Amino acid sequence: MNQDTICAIATAQGGAIGCIRVSGPDAIKITSRIFTPARKGKKLKDAKPYTLTFGHIHEEENIIDEVLVSLFRAPHSYTGEDSTEIMCHGSSYILQKVLQLLIGNGCRLAAPGEYTQRAFLGGKMDLSQAEAVADLIASTSAATHRLAMSQMRGGFSKELASLRDQLLHFTSLIELELDFSDHEELEFADRSELCLLADGIEQVISRLVQSFSVGNAIKNGVPVAIIGETNAGKSTLLNALLNEERAIVSDIHGTTRDVIEDTVNLGGITFRFIDTAGIRETNDTIENLGIERTFQKLEQAEIVLWIVDATNAVSQIPQLTTQILPRCEGKRLILVFNKTDLVQDASTIPNSSFTVAATNVQCISISAKGRTNLDKLQQMLISAANLPTVTQNDVIVTNIRHYEALTHALEAIHRVQQGLAENLSGDFVSQDIRECIFHLSDIAGEVTNDMVLGNIFEHFCIGK
């Protein structure tokens, strides 16, 4: 554990109030050097934990600001160390001045994520809970908030601990049998019972692995590719969905040559919209590169919005059949007839959609420019996302590192099942059980190396 005392601004710039966190063995002593309580005779070191003390930050005889200081004593603090939090006015000058005074009296400026890293190293939380802190800070919807809170409160950790306990019991039975292999009359592990235990563990790990598709969509947004021919109104639709001028709109064909991505929350679900280059035959090298990226993004999307210019719908349907439908297997495709405000005979639009009715493609007619039926399109997107309602009691994997570790653990438990089925020696089975335990422990940070820890915590903000 580090013996130095760290400090950092914990609040965003521009607010009326700012907060500076101080943590480490000398946190209270250093804060006392620059802080004087307003009540005469009172000293910060004598204050009770979890209380606020009003007073002044000073530089020699000069008062810098009126502040409130909260005090936390080890181990009952976020980091598990002695800590103080200085609430001052949000002026950038005041905040920087207080930091300078703290550093001048023995503090060091905290590295990104160092407070949470100290909490992890001090046993206040495991690594998955520490990562949930970053997810909570970055949460942009009710669902991402609920998942982060569940993980931070230890829901995922308890699931992992239960699995590890079962696996440790499993391997102890196997290894005990190995230790007494010379005593043929003794049988410590009934293979049929071990098979049932392995099956139960496999089901839990498999459920966690499968939950990642939902968790990843909730955390990073459901990827929605907006594709179509040039000048069909793709960028206009993106701007309408985002309620801002995110993409350049022009009557010139091929204006969008690169991929544009942005997110929006609809009905509590985050969607990641991907505006792509229009599909057409062209000799323009740069535009062709954009079209190649269009098909790449189409492969990555879960939902595809195929935008068709309703004024010329009949000519665009063949392209849908030959180029788009074969690439949309397993995806949800919504055929969007745009520019309906320019169509004189609306009956031509249903006739066009009838040609793809057998493919279970959903169809809708809109005017992105006039915002006609946009609300209906949004409801179709929410329905197509088909995400379950998430509660704080649900254990859903959202982190790619956790997913990879669980995938390796699942492979190991599959080898255990196979070994038991083939009646292999306990030596081989025990090795795979230990590998499964290793991967589960890696998630909680029990076997994680310093390089991995550094990569995780350096993505936190400095004050966390």
Residues covered by each model-derived region:
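A glycine-rich (often HGG/GG-containing) alpha/beta subdomain
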Residues: 1-146, 150, 154, 327, ...
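C-terminal-of-GTPase-core extension/linker across diverse P-loop GTPases
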Residues: 2-9, 145-265, 282-284, 300, ...
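Conserved nucleotide-binding/hydrolysis micro-motifs of P-loop NTPases
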Residues: 14, 25-27, 73-77, 91-93, ...
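Short, acidic/hydrophobic/Gly-rich beta-strand patch recurrent on exposed beta strands
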Residues: 21, 238, 275
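Switch I (G2) and immediately adjacent beta-strands of P-loop GTPase domains
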Residues: 53-73, 254-282, 300-303
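Conserved beta-strand segments of alpha/beta enzyme cores
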Residues: 108, 270-272, 362
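Generic enzyme active-site microenvironment
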Residues: 273, 307, 336
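Inter-motif core of Ras-like GTPase G domains
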Residues: 287-311
